[in-house]
Amino acid sequence: MTRLFGTDGVRGLAGRDLTAGLTLELAIAAAEVLPERGIPGKRPRAVVGRDPRASGEFLEAAVVAGLASAGVDVIRLGVLPTPAVAFLTGELDADFGVMLSASHNPAPDNGIKFFARGGHKLSDEVEDEIERRLGRAVAGATGRDVGRVTDDTDSVERYITHLVNSLPNRLDGLKVVVDCANGAAAGIAPEALRRAGADVIAIGDKPDGFNINEGCGSTNLDALRAAVLEHGADAGIAHDGDADRCQAVAADGSVVDGDQIMAVLALELYEANALHNNTLVVTVMSNLGLKLAMKEAGITLVETQVGDRYVLEAMRAGSYSLGGEQSGHIILLDHATTGDGLLTGMHLLAAVNRRGVALAELAKVMNRLPQVLVNVSGVDKTRVATSERIAAEVAAAEAELGDSGRVLLRPSGTEPIVRVMVEATSQDRAQAIADRLADVVRDELSINA
């Protein structure tokens, strides 16, 4: 049986895959599992937030109904970024948090993820326990034992204050464009940047429930690049639908991705003696150029499988303060318990302002090797690891590249695709090898074969 939880909670087409009924059952099962890891004898409490997708309204109602019927007090936070829900799980002393979002996915999709006490993502083992209890857990609270439901009207203010107070220096004098992806960051990211002193131009800041991530945000930087150039801004910051990731655009229109952002922040923390154990945690998808730059700076690199949850697990295990993914999920563990796009963007801008150097120049701390990523759809991703032909082709490509590049082929944890990533000394060489491997994957794993 396929595992219900992916690398970032449960996702699917809202109303078909992620139904009100399934969401209700997940909430009831979570209410049975998560308070067991809370404080004995204390009435369970949960916070619930969502991004602005229209389907979030009925899914929120299902979550609240499930939790309250299981005897959990519920604090509705409204529309907030995922990291804000994680922060408020701890800030409001909740036993757990619930976020409804499908992150960078299109508007018809939605998802549900849980945070444990303190705002940390759940381990695979805890998610498996919730999944095992689906349909078995009983919402048996009656009378005075049913959960009460309240709204926290200060949630946005609490989060913005937290962001601004985390900065090592202000952003006065910087002109910044922020793309809110018509998502949860709308109205929050611009205000946080303004309070930190920046001159802000906001785009993608008019969510209507159906336009989230549509032609905007961290997975589509064209609008941000155009706005940065049009307004003569010092930098642009882009978030995804739930604002747990960040990508940047420099004044010259060049893209500064998650690897480059991590390189800048790692050196900032290193110089301030705040990079715990002089270590940066990344995933196997990070560019080889980042690894070489950190080695030259004397910073140790710890590598994990793809998924910010695995980055976080390694960070907590080793007491490290910085880690993340090339996609822009970056964790500043001294200030947050999970990837926070707003926090990341503001700390990047603080580094730009403190050094008085253009972002494009600052990003040159690492030399990014040409990288090609091909997403192969219409294939059975579950057979990747068992295909001898694919393994042989990958080995041949690795031998061809030697020390001047690398190959990574893996199934997506959140989508029905296989990702083929190749790095090489030239874009053409990387593209040719990636295309060749993608053709093998299609031929070998095609669902229609």
From Swiss-Prot:
Entry cofactors: Mg(2+)
SUPFAM superfamilies in UniProt: Phosphoglucomutase, C-terminal domain, Phosphoglucomutase, first 3 domains
Post-translational modification (record): Activated by phosphorylation.
PTM sites of type Phosphoserine: 103
Pfam entry (one): PGM_PMM_II
Positions annotated as active site in the UniProt record: 103
GO biological process: one example: carbohydrate metabolic process
InterPro entries: A-D-PHexomutase_a/b/a-I, A-D-PHexomutase_a/b/a-I/II/III, A-D-PHexomutase_a/b/a-II, A-D-PHexomutase_a/b/a-III, A-D-PHexomutase_C, A-D-PHexomutase_C_sf, A-D-PHexomutase_CS, Alpha-D-phosphohexomutase_SF
Protein's UniProt name: Phosphoglucosamine mutase
Source organism per UniProt: Thermobifida fusca (strain YX)
